[in-house]
Amino acid sequence: MAMKSVSNFAIFLILFLVTSEISEIEAKDKECLKGYIDAPLSYCMARIYPSLCYRNCRFYKGAKGGKCDGLKCFCDFCSDKPF
């Protein structure tokens, strides 16, 4: 009986630690990525490297980079990786 309660405690502890780390990662992404509101669709439609989203976020918004999610452009203020 004692072994079962220790196992249950260990499982709940692991789940708690995993969920707290995931929320911390999501919060960091929200701080880093800001939507480029006035970006035309062509910023993410053109298949060039690095994308127009990446280039214009760096030039006009002062970001380190930019990423496309579908046809939406997001300026990345934490990372300069073009993907």
UniProtKB/Swiss-Prot annotation:
GO terms for biological process: defense response to fungus; killing of cells of another organism. The record marks 47-48 as: Reactive bond. Changing residue 20 to Y: In strain: cv. Nok-0. Pfam families: Toxin_3. SUPFAM superfamilies: Scorpion toxin-like (SSF57095). One of its GO terms (molecular function) is sodium channel inhibitor activity. It is found in: Secreted. Gene3D superfamilies: Knottin, scorpion toxin-like (3.30.30.10). SMART domains: Knot1. Changing residue 11 to T: In strain: cv. Cvi-1 and cv. Nd-1. Keywords: Antimicrobial, Disulfide bond, Fungicide, Plant defense, Secreted, Signal. It comes from the Eukaryota. Disulfide bonds join 32-78, 44-68, 53-73, 57-75. Residues 1-27 form the signal peptide. The keyword Repressor does not apply. Its main location: secreted. GO terms for cellular component: extracellular region. Belongs to the DEFL family. Protease inhibitor I18 (RTI/MTI-2) subfamily. This is Defensin-like protein 194. It comes from Arabidopsis thaliana (Mouse-ear cress). The lineage of its organism: Eukaryota, Viridiplantae, Streptophyta, Embryophyta, Tracheophyta. The gene is ATTI3.
